[in-house]
């Protein structure tokens, strides 16, 4: 018999930081849950007391974490690489797109730079779809913006500066009908909204650990669809990019030869699993944290997380509107995420954020407004404390 899902209140009890702060800032970062900290601490204590004697068990744990993430995203472990950031993942994606002859990528004009700048640095041309005045981006606007040169569409599952939850399935269908690569920036999505890369027919997905995932800073995740791994060359390599039996050869006299299946070096081919993109050693403690965080998310259920965040957003937006604030995206359930951004009158947004921080309320200044995030660990009292602080500090909506 399956255990009942962990409730938001039960999860909240695992975050000691919430006893001293009203944390409405998951879109920037989340506090570390106690089980995640404990897992990291056990690993670090082991290295303190035994050095790297436990290395074989670390390697096994890395494989288990990769398999855990694969279940979470509904893909195979061989399609996943661990990186240090979403931006690094998008650099890899840009290089693989270029190998396929793709030169132009369509995205939203309001995309976060971890989507756009890596692709620009990789030499790709970007075209942007502008949000409508109501803050939405209907699929027909994407379709109208396509050109004969467009080879891919890249979007964030949730927009960082507005909170718009993009219709990924509609974009996926458009990509499939036009033979375009489909790329998802999941930095604001993973651990926040359900993501199934198989159901989405995604070609790539890149994400990070420290926001909604609650796994601390420093670990990135990259999904590369198997077909891309088998038909493109590694954009770079390292000792972990070759078979284990060849990892300790010097290769000093090797020569590189390109063929249809990838690079060869004196008869040796690089691996075609996504993990070959890791090239070298990474953050073991970050992977330990990721595995523990995934366990928490599975205990709650990501669909339950989104529903809880939306419920708090409904309360928040209703009360903000009573005070004259206007969120930059609609309240409709189909586009609603755990992010709300409202323009504020007067002082720079960073100053408003700082005033709230003095009240022990954590928010963020983004896209010219105050960004308020509701996550699974939040409760109605958090929203009410924010509203009380807004009233007490005399923070007013823009245009009033």
Report the location of each language-model feature:
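Pyridoxal 5′-phosphate
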Residues: 1-400
